[in-house]
């Protein structure tokens, strides 16, 4: 196999592990609403991971909304998280630009009953 295929498979497996606790909560992913938040639009790594995540979660009955911030900054991701918290998805899986800057907002999401997981976060 070439390196791109192996990378894509590994990315997909990693991202899917983020959804496992959410989809295990119900019978598979039936009715679960999951938001997948990227670092920025056009990030090749995230595009591959998001595609695999979305395909697998939707095959299990979940609905996945892939969301990108306006800029590759923590402040832009905070705006995305504010919007998502008001929508009350079952889970948010985020590739954080700055996990320390997002900590309070992610705790707010968890306090609102939203499951939160992170991957590829610095």
Identify the residue ranges that each predicted region occupies.
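A residue-level marker of the well-folded mature domains of exported/periplasmic proteins
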Residues: 2-10, 14, 22-122
């Amino acid at each position: 196999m070439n390196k791109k295929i192996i990378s894509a498979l590994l990315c997909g497996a990693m991202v899917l592990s983020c959804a496992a606790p959410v989809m295990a909560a119900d019978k598979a992913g039936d009715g679960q609403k999951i938001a997948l938040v990227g670092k920025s639009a056009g990030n090749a790594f995230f595009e591959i991971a998001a595609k695999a995540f979305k395909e697998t979660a939707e095959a299990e009955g979940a609905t996945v909304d892939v969301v990108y911030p306006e800029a590759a900054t923590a402040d832009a991701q905070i705006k995305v998280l504010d919007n998502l918290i008001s929508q009350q998805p079952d889970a948010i899986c985020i590739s954080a630009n700055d996990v320390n800057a997002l900590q309070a907002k992610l705790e707010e999401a968890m306090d609102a009953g939203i499951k939160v997981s992170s991957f590829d976060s610095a």
